[in-house]
Every structure is written in C-alpha cells, then in structure tokens.
Amino acid sequence: LYSRVDCWQGDEISFKYKNKNIVKKIKTRKSMRKFLLLGIILSAATLLSAQTKEDVIYNPIITGVPSLSISPDAVGGAMGDVGVASKPTLASQFWNSSKYAMMDSKGGLTLSYTPWLRKIVNDVDLVYLAGYYNISEQFGTLSASLRYFSLGNITLRDYNGTELGNAKPYEMSFDLGYSRRLAEYFSMGVALRFVASELNAKTEGYYTGIGFAADVNGYYSRPIEVSSGTSRLGLGFNISNIGSKISYNKGVSSNFMPTNLGIGASYLFPFDAYNRIALNVDLNKLMVPSRRSKYATGFNQSDPATWAMSDKQYSEISVVKGIFTSFSDAPGGFSEELKEISVSTGLEYAYNEQFFVRAGYHGEHIEKGNRQFFSAGAGFKWTAFTLDVGYLIGVSQNNPLDQTLRFTLSFDMDGLKDLMD
C-alpha cells in the first residue's frame, strides 16, 4: 500500500501511497511518527537508524510482513538475536524448530511480550506464544506458535492535514511444526505458517493481505568430553518463510515474504559442575531479490534505464526464481551481496542451570538497514518456570531500537509434574 518512504528528516516526514488513479500525500508532524513506522514496516521491511550520511546510498531489501523477522523472545534477543544453533529453548519455533526434537522434557509453553520501538511510539507491541509436545522418539515432536504484532492506533490525514479517521494495523501469523531426530546427534524439522497483514487504512481497493509460508531446518548437537565435564558443539540451519507473495489489492501488486537463510554455530563449555558458558554465532541473509533502482549502488545518472526496474518487472519475478537469484542480483555485485549478510554473536553464562546472564551484538551493514545494537539480559529458573528479560542498546545515537525490552515467561511440563508430585 505504501510504495515508498520519500523523506525522513526528524519529525517532518512525508510519503506517498497509490491507489489506481488516486495519489495522496500524507504530511504531518507528531502523529506522523507512527506513519513513519507503518511505512517502514509495510514497504521498507527494515528499521533504519536515523543516520544521515551523504556518502551512503541506502538499498535495503524490500519485503512484505517484515514483522516476521523480529526476534520475539528475551533469550535470543538478549544475545544479539542468535538462536539457529544455540541451546534449544521453548521459543525454538522461531529460530529453528528442529531443536525441539533434542529437548529432554515432554513439552512446554512460552509467552513473550515486547513493547516495540518505545523510543518512538508507546503503543506498538509484539506478543508471541509458542510451545511443543514430544510424542515419542519414534513419532517425533509437534510444535506451534502464534505471533501478533500491533502497530497501535494511527490517525490518518491527507496532505492538507484533514483527518481521515483512525486505523489499527496489525500483522499476525500462526504456524504448526513437526521435528524428528534422524540420528543420535541430528534432527530436522518443518513448519507451515499462515500469515495475515491488516493495514486498516480505509482505502478503497485494498484488503487484508493473506499468505502462506514454510520453514525447513536442521540441528546438529554433539557432546564432547573435556576435563571439566561435557561440552557441546551445535550447528544449525533454518530457511524460513518460504512461501507465497502477499498482496493487499488482490494481486495487482505484491510483496515477497521475508524468506531468510540462517546458519549458526554454538559451543557450550562447562567450567565445573555448576558453571558453564555458551558462545553463539549466527549469519543471516534474506533470500529475496534485490531491486535495481536509482537509489541502488552503481546507479548511472546519465543512463537511468540501466538500473531502473519497474514495479511490474519486479512483481513478475517468481518466488523460486527470487530465492536463487538473491545470491547474485545485487546491483553492486558480489561486494554488495556480502553486505546483505547480518552477523549476530551471543554469550550466555549459567550457574547450575538456574541463573543466566547474557550479552550479544547484532551487526547489519548501513546500506542494508543499519540495525546495529548491543544486547544484554538475565534469566531465572525455578522448578517448572523460567523468567527471562532482554534489553537492546543501540550503537548509533538515534537508533529507534535503543532501549527495547523483551520479557519471556516459560514453563516446562516435566518440571510442572515434579512440582505437583
């Protein structure tokens, strides 16, 4: 619906959206902060730090339903957004659902809440509910999750400042997963996802965006005996959100899902019977075609047609073709492809598997979104229940992700059973 963010300069922001022959321009000040967020969420699919450098040409990859890429839980979020190969948690449905098959408990449930972008707005929230049940080693493990991302209440205005009403846009998804241990140290999983994106913009000709997607993932976890106990090496991959495009106007135009390739490695090392640390590293790359435009690296001002790609041409790229070409279609060549890879590193210290302290860093190239932040967090486990908290610290001065908090409450079925006995 919102085809382009035209301007981002402090509080004064304007952008255009098109509806067939209708072109409206929305421009205001205070209330436009939410419109900025909506424009980014729906069209840019990435949250840019408010840095203005004349020598930087921003070329983020555009997707629909970008909230699917927001890490929902306080454990992975406190470690720089890692989770592809880290120790399995109850929120593994988002990171790598095949990890559920490696969990010792019969099942569990987790609820996470994130007041998102509190530095900009006060009513944007992400709620995430996930759980799993281990049927048996022979029949595998079932898992599910529900995600709801609310963009709060937004006042719609035309470019004259006249109010057009209020909107309450949201994005949500529901998915079911199955995972199974295929070997002593290796498991695989799949998840099927239903996605709905409601703009609530009260514009004729636009509807709720509906889409379907799937995840395919694997996890390798091998114990290694060391002098202080048993360490563990973890390796994993997750190809997430492989699926249909999403459209708000019944196919007239459509956006790619945020299909993502994530690979990770982890190493858990025990100092003694009570103390251990875990080191985690994830690499992520969107498997979505780059869009060549005058804003892209390498644009030749004297020959705009060289890099220009019309909306129609881009929308005609199939999902399968887009996945494979996403590794070689960046306008800036191989060097720009490398810029599309984000890096997450995380460290976790645990005492007696009851007290946890976490820290991490997430880095994304400035041309591809500039989401750069440090993170920290802590957790406490008491029998069946675990409470985790995560906190983000933006690298840049005006990073909208700065001061973001995450809260996660989890309970374990085996622990709950022991508590009842």
Region roles according to the model:
Residues 1-63, 415-421:
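Cleavable N-terminal export/targeting peptides
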Residues 51-421:
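Subset of outer-membrane beta-barrel
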